[in-house]
């Protein structure tokens, strides 16, 4: 399961389900001296190599965190999300968004990315979500509660499947 770094519990759940995490974040994310404005971006070259090696059918989804906690809260650019969506549409791969800190990521886009300075954070959040097939959100972070979260899916069948599992795991 390719992703822009990982969050510990997300990676654990992926591995418990039989997946294997593969980091496809840009190299600048690992360089504290780099001044790259969007160190959370997916390296599409690394992703392309992974798809060629394993085949798109063996990649259930790409996990994109906004912002990337393990990289010190680094944001993902809208341009990168658009390119990722184009890539995944071509290969039939889903994009799942960890949107726990999406408001901060949207603010960084507003402040740093050309064409977004006059856009509201809310409209940027909506655009980000439009490039994905589903999202997870942890209420334990910015929502200021000690428990909870949600899963949103564009696929009704996957939604029904997940709803049935909630009964077992809630």
Predicted regions and their residues:
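Conserved PLP-enzyme active-site core in the AAT-like
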Residues: 1-170
């Amino acid at each position: 399961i390719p992703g822009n770094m990982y969050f510990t519990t997300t990676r654990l759940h992926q591995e418990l389900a039989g997946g294997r995490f593969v980091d496809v974040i840009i190299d600048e994310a690992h360089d504290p001296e780099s001044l790259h404005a969007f160190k959370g971006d997916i390296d599409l070259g690394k992703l392309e190599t992974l798809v060629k090696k394993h085949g798109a059918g063996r990649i259930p989804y790409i996990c994109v965190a906004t912002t990337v906690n393990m990289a010190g809260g680094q944001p993902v650019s809208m341009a990168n999300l658009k390119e990722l969506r184009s890539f995944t549409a071509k290969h039939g791969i889903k994009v799942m968004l960890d949107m726990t800190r999406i408001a901060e990521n949207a603010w960084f886009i507003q402040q740093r990315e050309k064409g977004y300075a006059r856009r509201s954070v809310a409209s940027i959040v909506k655009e980000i979500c439009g490039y994905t097939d589903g999202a997870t959100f942890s209420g334990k972070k910015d929502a200021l509660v000690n428990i909870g979260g949600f899963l949103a899916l564009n696929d009704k069948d996957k939604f029904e499947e997940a709803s049935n599992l909630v009964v077992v795991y809630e």
